[in-house]
Amino acid sequence: MRVVLIVLDSVGIGEMPDAHLYGDEGSNTIVNTAKAVGGLHLPNMAKLGLGNLDDIPGVEPVKPAEGIYGKMMEKSPGKDTTTGHWEIAGVILKKPFDLFPNGFPKELIEEFERRTGRKVIGNKPASGTEIIKELGPIHEKTGALIVYTSADSVFQIAAKKEIVPVEELYRYCKIARELLDEMGYKVARVIARPFTGEWPNYVRTPERKDFSLEPEGKTLLDVLTENGIPVYGVGKIADIFAGRGVTENYKTKDNNDGIDKTISLMKEKNHDCLIFTNLVDFDTKYGHRNDPVSYARALEEFDVRLPEIIQNLKEDDVLFITADHGCDPTTPSTDHSREMVPLLGYGGRLKKDVYVGIRETFADLGQTIADIFGVPPLENGTSFKNLIWE
């Protein structure tokens, strides 16, 4: 038996009860995107029950639905990729990741400069493409590293590969990771951001690399691999979990490549396993850029390919589709939004047309997957296997 778990990165379905604490009242990524484009055409997700979860223009409720459907609330504080994926896998954060709206503390930067032997410029929240345009010429002259953050818990280092070779940049990222951990700063990811080209037309290269914090507890991935069930990551899964519990990981260029790689794994791996896929374009390419038209198109493109995924399920396989947070492209904010996420499920062993309700934590999904595989339970979450299993 195989479980295929697909995370549509940032595809939220309505504000959490505490959204006002995050400045996210009124956010509803799917519904507001549908309104902005005069309706979404998502017939395949509609068949599974998506339209039964909210009033989504263009996506009709279907009775009886062919799948199981519900929504999940986030129990952890935060609204980022790491927090969301860890919680899906059973780890609930007690304390949110540290954010640096005014840049990183002086003593941290000074120690980083000492250990790397290079000066730091920037040290503020910024868009990655803007800051290299602003500071690239100084970096080229002096060899100083461009350090910046964002609305997420990230320490990003940008350098031109002709000035700082990529392997050297990775070494500086490892230094930053060790230093943050030593000094007790809880930063989700240190990210290497190499670029090339000439000012003002610098381009970022594909050698981006994430140095993630390890999950703060045992995840579904750890429990499965410890019990001899491999986990195949597609997209940035290995980065999110700092490589822990991921048997093999397949990097992706874009959503379609992620779907292709997921289907290849379904064709190739005929043993019990978890295929865990993150499709990130919704978030990085369209949500943060407040582009509801392209966001809608990406949702429709995924929906067109959903039947291919379903055709490659064997009789006892299970498919789950969910998200990790919101990123409403119609609100003034370009940041993530604190939202509930949709949950859709389908498989030969699952009942049809079952509403699993609004789950209190994303961890209910991880716990259910552990239950389906018959491995020891996770620390958090309540399994709903009994509601959905034939």
UniProtKB/Swiss-Prot annotation:
Superkingdom field: Bacteria
Amino-acid positions noted as binding Mn(2+) 1 in the UniProt annotation, renumbered to this chain: D9, D324, H325
Reaction(s) catalysed (UniProt annotation): 2-deoxy-alpha-D-ribose 1-phosphate = 2-deoxy-D-ribose 5-phosphate; alpha-D-ribose 1-phosphate = D-ribose 5-phosphate
EC numbers: 5.4.2.7
Location(s), subcellular: Cytoplasm
Source organism: Thermotoga petrophila (strain ATCC BAA-488 / DSM 13995 / JCM 10881 / RKU-1)
Protein name as annotated: Phosphopentomutase
GO biological process: 2-deoxyribose 1-phosphate catabolic process; 5-phosphoribose 1-diphosphate biosynthetic process; metabolic compound salvage; nucleotide metabolic process
Entry function: Isomerase that catalyzes the conversion of deoxy-ribose 1-phosphate (dRib-1-P) and ribose 1-phosphate (Rib-1-P) to deoxy-ribose 5-phosphate (dRib-5-P) and ribose 5-phosphate (Rib-5-P), respectively.
Enzyme class: isomerase
Keywords (A to Z) from UniProt: Cytoplasm, Isomerase, Manganese, Metal-binding
Pathway: Carbohydrate degradation; 2-deoxy-D-ribose 1-phosphate degradation; D-glyceraldehyde 3-phosphate and acetaldehyde from 2-deoxy-alpha-D-ribose 1-phosphate: step 1/2
Pfam family, one: Metalloenzyme
Binding-site positions, Mn(2+) 2: D283, H288, H336
Similarity annotation: Belongs to the phosphopentomutase family.
Lineage, broadest ranks: Bacteria, Thermotogati, Thermotogota, Thermotogae, Thermotogales
Gene3D superfamilies the record matches: Alkaline Phosphatase, subunit A (3.40.720.10), Phosphopentomutase (3.30.70.1250)
GO MF terms held by the record: magnesium ion binding; manganese ion binding; phosphopentomutase activity
A GO cellular-component term linked to this record: cytosol
Cofactor annotation remark: Binds 2 manganese ions.
